[in-house]
Amino acid sequence: MPVLHNRISNDELKAKMLAESEPRTTISFYKYFTIASPQQTRDALYQVFTALDVFGRVYLAHEGINAQISVPQSKVETFRQQLYTFDPALDGLRLNIALEDDGKSFWVLRMKVRDRIVADGIDDPSFDASNVGDYLKAADVNVMLDDPDAVFIDMRNHYEYEVGHFENALEIPADTFREQLPKAVEMLREHADKKIVMYCTGGIRCEKASAWMKHNGFNKVWHIEGGIIEYARRAREQGLPVRFIGKNFVFDERMGERISDEVIAHCHQCGAPCDSHTNCKNDGCHLLFIQCPQCASKFNGCCSEQCCEELALPEEEQRRRRAGRENGNKIFNKSRGRLNSKLSIPDPAE
């Protein structure tokens, strides 16, 4: 029986990917459809993807599939054909091609079975996820942006909104999608008579969010087809003004795609204009935050003097300090004061 998971170290895989001479294409896609046996589907897809040298992150659940991957350019069309013929529900599926791509977005293939393909926290048996809002294409998005009766809702996390968003879009401040859904309903009650336009990176979150809003009594709900990625691509192809400002955050090694020239965020350490996310170089912290080149040099890629000092310790001492330390997904959140004035490690209990 073939091995259906990776057995090579991350360092070795990353070095191998960086040494590759063939360009790669970064692709994202999702589909809500019923998968009777997610584990069986996962194992079959794993063999298809590994045969094509696909890297990336793929989640499967009874409700569908969610994938962010990179494919060797010479194998993109073969990948497309094999994906489309794998299951009738995937035939003709829209593939979002990265807007900015150095081909180094992923270096390992990870495929996991989960309860949901996007964690929504919804526990309501009467919720119909298929009753979604209407799609908006790029030209229609620009029309809606000029409609005083329309409200644009950003269904991404606060750190994504911070570096880029549509003009006058409403932020639903939260660290996770599951936190956003109830907040969105609460915040939009006063706009119940408006046209609600929801968007996210590639469409998966705003599609489900549009169904959740309709479930909660909102009748005029739209969502942007293919999210920010598809909107920007189609607007450029059609010669339309691109109304998204700043950078589109992405969940891979690139950390972002430049959409417009404006830099609307600031370094979390000195306040200089900057929209480049990074993870604290101290493995015992790994905080996600925005850091300008000057502060990266000053703090050696760390989020604080404390982490700088820890990074300078012998590796054995660093490992000892990391042992038993809570180190989940930590994110700098200015609005909630997750860090103190010295930008030390946030309280993991928060």
From Swiss-Prot:
GO terms for molecular function: oxidoreductase activity, acting on paired donors, with incorporation or reduction of molecular oxygen. Signal peptide: none annotated. It comes from the Bacteria. It catalyses: uridine(34) in tRNA + AH2 + O2 = 5-hydroxyuridine(34) in tRNA + A + H2O. Its EC number is 1.14.-.-. Residues 319-350 are annotated as: Disordered. Catalyzes oxygen-dependent 5-hydroxyuridine (ho5U) modification at position 34 in tRNAs. Belongs to the TrhO family. NCBIfam families: PRK00142.1-1. This is tRNA uridine(34) hydroxylase. It comes from Salmonella agona (strain SL483). The lineage of its organism: Bacteria, Pseudomonadati, Pseudomonadota, Gammaproteobacteria, Enterobacterales.
